[in-house]
Amino acid sequence: MEKVPGEMEIERRERSEELSEAERKAVQAMWARLYANCEDVGVAILVRFFVNFPSAKQYFSQFKHMEDPLEMERSPQLRKHACRVMGALNTVVENLHDPDKVSSVLALVGKAHALKHKVEPVYFKILSGVILEVVAEEFASDFPPETQRAWAKLRGLIYSHVTAAYKEVGWVQQVPNATTPPATLPSSGP
C-alpha cells in the first residue's frame, strides 16, 4: 500500500536550517557529479517516484496511464520533466550561497505547482526523499554521515520554502473526490 501523509504533514513545518559553508561545498561537489548525468539521474528519480508513489502520476496527463517502469523511462514527456526538475534543483544547489535566490526559485516552483498544477505539497517531501535515496545509492561508498546530514538539511530547506509558497497563495488541501484518489491506495489490482 502506498501511504501519502495527510494534512498534518503540511501543518508540521519542517525546521529549515541554513547549510554551513562546508555543507554547501559537500552538497555542491556531489551534485556536480550527479548533474553530469542530468537526464538519466532525473529519469531514475521520477521513475522510482512514480513506481513507489503511483498516486503522484495523477498530476501528469501525459504519462499517468503508464505502469511499466521501462515505458516511463522511454517517455519523452517524462524525460523532459526530469530535465526540468533537475534544472530547478541545479539552480537551487548552485545558489546555496544566496538565500534570496534559493527562496525566489523555490517560491516560483511552489506557486506554479499550487496554482497551475494543483499538486499537493506533500509530494515535494516525498520526491525529495526519493532524490536522497538515489543520491545515497549513486554514492554509496562516498556518502559519509556529515554529507548525509547536509543533504537532509537541503531537503528540509526545499520543503520549507515550497510549503511557504503554498501558504502564501492560500493553498487549501484538496479533498479526495472522484478524480483525486484518497491518501491510501492499494499498490496493485484486486
Swiss-Prot record:
List the catalytic activities from the record. Fe(II)-heme b-[protein] + nitric oxide + O2 = Fe(III)-heme b-[protein] + nitrate; Fe(III)-heme b-[protein] + nitric oxide + H2O = Fe(II)-heme b-[protein] + nitrite + 2 H(+); 2 superoxide + 2 H(+) = H2O2 + O2; H2O2 + AH2 = A + 2 H2O
User: What does the UniProt record note about how this protein's activity is regulated?
Assistant: The nitric oxide dioxygenase activity is activated by a reducing system composed of cytochrome b5, its upstream reductase CYB5R3 and NADH.
Quaternary structure and partners: Monomeric. Homodimer; disulfide-linked in vitro. Also homooligomeric in vitro.
Q: Where is the Globin domain?
A: 18-167
- Provide the residue positions that the database annotates as binding heme b: 81, 113
What role is this protein assigned? Answer: Probable multifunctional globin with a hexacoordinated heme iron required for the catalysis of various reactions depending on redox condition of the cell as well as oxygen availability. Has a nitric oxide dioxygenase (NOD) activity and is most probably involved in cell-mediated and oxygen-dependent nitric oxide consumption. By scavenging this second messenger may regulate several biological processes including endothelium-mediated vasodilation and vascular tone.
Q: What tissues has this protein been observed in?
A: Widely expressed. Highest expression in heart, stomach, bladder and small intestine.
Q: List the disulfide bonds.
A: 38-83
The UniProt entry's GO biological process terms, in alphabetical order, are: fatty acid oxidation; negative regulation of collagen biosynthetic process; negative regulation of fibroblast migration; negative regulation of hepatic stellate cell activation; nitric oxide catabolic process; nitric oxide metabolic process; oxygen transport; removal of superoxide radicals
Q: Which UniProt keywords apply?
A: Cytoplasm, Disulfide bond, Heme, Iron, Metal-binding, Nucleus, Oxidoreductase
UniProt-listed InterPro entries: Globin, Globin-like_sf, Globin/Proto, Globin_lamprey/hagfish
Gene3D superfamilies, alphabetized: Globins
Q: What is its EC number?
A: 1.14.12.-, 1.7.-.-, 1.11.1.-, 1.15.1.1
**What GO MF terms are annotated?**
carbon monoxide binding; catalase activity; fatty acid peroxidase activity; heme binding; iron ion binding; nitric oxide dioxygenase activity, heme protein as donor; nitrite reductase activity; oxidoreductase activity
State the protein's name. Cytoglobin
- According to its UniProt record, which protein family does this protein belong to? Belongs to the globin family.
Q: Does the keyword Amino-acid biosynthesis apply?
A: no
